[in-house]
């Protein structure tokens, strides 16, 4: 099967699939049409870049399936239409690129040095104005706080208090919360010193590592 360099038709097919799966927000769909996912994977994975599947990106990690990213982005847009966003878990850099395409000011943290280096190089090559750093994402980025939204791309065992403290008043934290086997996508909204929780669908993410994540040796 032959592809053009931009893989426009494949990208349109992916967006149509997301629409059939229930993603309705036009901003989110437009962002997925704009960002070239195949530039965030390497080798043979590129031919599957616009399938709705997770793909290996090295270092034992994967790029999330498009539907999962779109689901989180739709929750974000519906709860925080603009502003400053912190992403926990840069991975390939694809979701940060989507956030940028949505018009947010993006900060992202990765704990795996190799992934951080690859993603940073992609951002520079593609001209994506994302601020990235290597470190423990569960501790957030206090020097840049507060954030209008924080997105966590790995399964959290409990509410990460440090991240919650870095939300602006009215800000939202979106994360998969639960066990190692299954997590509920959760939106936590800050209202002054109170935090409101709302649960959505269930997913299966890799575990969140760090001081407020899962221990390295599972449970």
Swiss-Prot record:
Class of enzymatic activity (EC top level): transferase
Recorded catalytic activity of this chain's protein: [protein]-L-isoaspartate + S-adenosyl-L-methionine = [protein]-L-isoaspartate alpha-methyl ester + S-adenosyl-L-homocysteine
GO molecular function, one term: protein-L-isoaspartate (D-aspartate) O-methyltransferase activity
Gene3D superfamilies named in the record: Vaccinia Virus protein VP39
Location of the active site: 64
GO biological process, one term: protein modification process
Keyword entries, A-Z: Cytoplasm, Methyltransferase, S-adenosyl-L-methionine, Transferase
Stated family: Belongs to the methyltransferase superfamily. L-isoaspartyl/D-aspartyl protein methyltransferase family.
PANTHER family for this protein: PROTEIN-L-ISOASPARTATE O-METHYLTRANSFERASE (PTHR11579), PROTEIN-L-ISOASPARTATE(D-ASPARTATE) O-METHYLTRANSFERASE (PTHR11579:SF0)
Protein name: Protein-L-isoaspartate O-methyltransferase
Gene source species: Chlorobaculum parvum (strain DSM 263 / NCIMB 8327)
